[in-house]
Design a protein with these regions (language model features):
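PRPP-associated nucleotide enzymes
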Residues: 1-109
Length: 109
């Protein structure tokens, strides 16, 4: 992994992420396939980017007995940078359906 990354930046080098990126960049990928691969890529990104999220214990009732599991310790906000980041939201929400979604707008000359 490159050592010159800024603090807080994670470079995901998982083979499945690399494959999905290759498929996204391929000129032969049509719009339907592009959206499907982007959804898959964002799901993989969520798994990697949430690796160190704090959790807290929570007790639930199973059909047989109480069970102590884990829940997120704090609320999570997904904030895609408009407009390109919007395509990543669906895959993220598939794993984190209760998060808040904010939006960041940026432009360039």
């Amino acid at each position: 992994m490159p050592e010159n990354l800024p603090p807080g930046v994670t470079l995901i080098q998982h083979p499945l992420v690399q494959i999905k990126l290759t498929q996204l960049r391929d000129v032969k990928t049509d719009s339907r396939e592009f959206r499907a691969r982007l959804n898959e890529l964002s799901t993989l990104m969520v798994i990697e980017s949430t690796r160190d999220l704090a959790t807290r214990p929570v007790v639930i009732q199973t059909p047989l007995a109480p069970y102590e599991g884990r829940a997120l310790a704090r609320p999570v906000i997904v904030a895609p940078i408009l407009r390109a980041g919007l395509g990543l939201v669906e895959g993220m929400l598939s794993l984190l359906p209760d998060v808040s979604v904010a939006h960041i707008g940026m432009f360039r000359n």
